[in-house]
Amino acid sequence: MANKVLRKVTHCVFDMDGLLLDTERLYTVATEMILEPYGKTYPFEIKEQVMGLQTEPLARFMVEHYELPMSWEEYARQQRANTEILMRNAQLMPGAERLLRHLHANKVPFCLATSSGADMVELKTAQHRELFSLFNHKVCGSSDKEVVNGKPAPDIFLVAAGRFGVPPKPSDCLVFEDSPNGVTAANSAGMQVVMVPDPRLSQEKTSHATQVLASLADFKPEQFGLPAFTD
């Protein structure tokens, strides 16, 4: 991938699942618990298609793709029940806490923009309440009425930017994502996007990001005009 021009930004917007919290692995287990009784498997090629989707489109896709004898509502209910059990001990991804505390200490405004509903965000962040209190605000796509269309549509990022005290231009926002759907949404919103993808994703699925990193620990804020780490 050719080097892309990195533009100075003033605000940051973070996805949550698979980026800040190690939840994608737990989602896989929760999904396999539903599929196993029907003799179905959940290969990565399917998982990468639904990463970043909100509850209803994800559930509709799974029921249709696997021809499951249930409604999308029932699928979503089972997924939620499994997830509630598994997510209580979700751990932070490498580099996440350092970056968030650095931005907060340097008064760089940042917010959360996740496809999860507000109640699931509360559940997943239960072990990290203080850290997640540092966000200026949280936009929870599956339960926020202003987010009409989920990722890959740009709605969630535009809503998130609009809720800062002094809303920045989209071009002044830097999005952090792990999913192709999220990257597409950020690009459509007119924002730069740093992607920390699952290493199994093909280069084709990561090529539209402004920058691709193996970990948030590799992020260099000064490349986007933000204060550099001093530790």
Curated annotation (Swiss-Prot):
The keyword DNA damage does not apply. Its cofactor is Mg(2+). It comes from the Eukaryota. Disulfide bonds: none annotated. It catalyses: psi-UMP + H2O = pseudouridine + phosphate. SUPFAM superfamilies: HAD-like (SSF56784). This is Probable pseudouridine-5'-phosphatase. It comes from Drosophila melanogaster (Fruit fly). The lineage of its organism: Eukaryota, Metazoa, Ecdysozoa, Arthropoda, Hexapoda. The gene is Gs1l.
